[in-house]
């Protein structure tokens, strides 16, 4: 597995885009996508020779990231690419990680499977199944 992106919760996705551009030189890589399952808006930012940043804004109070945004936002997860998401989940569970979200279609990844796990260091981990369509998006 390799790191794909860092997920950061923001109060306003538009303000977040502007902040990351002004302060760190990141450019908007994708359109803003609404993830109806997680009740969030997401956008990917990129900078040459740097890790991708995914900004995450809750769309309502029932979003899993709403409380983080309400407190000002912050680091939410590290995302890793994997080739066989179910096998990787099984392996990580044997190492003590706990599944938070079972594999489901990820709207920001052309509905290729994603899953969230929680490690014993209290850090959310997102797994991205690197199917054919996902590779096209991830490698841009």
Residue spans of the language-model regions?
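Conserved N-terminal glycine/acidic-rich loop preference
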Residues: 7-9, 34-56
């Amino acid at each position: 597995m390799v790191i794909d992106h860092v997920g950061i919760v923001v109060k306003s996705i538009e303000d977040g885009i502007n902040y990351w551009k002004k302060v760190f030189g990141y450019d908007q890589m994708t359109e803003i996508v609404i993830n109806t399952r997680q009740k969030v808006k997401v956008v990917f930012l990129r900078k040459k020779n740097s890790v991708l940043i995914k900004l995450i804004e809750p769309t309502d109070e029932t979003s899993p990231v709403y409380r983080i945004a309400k407190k000002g936002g912050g680091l939410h997860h590290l995302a890793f690419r994997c080739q066989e998401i179910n096998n990787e989940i099984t392996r990580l569970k044997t190492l003590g990680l706990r599944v938070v979200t079972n594999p489901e279609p990820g709207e920001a990844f052309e509905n290729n499977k994603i899953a969230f796990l929680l490690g014993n260091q209290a850090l959310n981990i997102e797994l991205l199944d690197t199917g054919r369509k996902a590779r096209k998006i991830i490698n841009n």
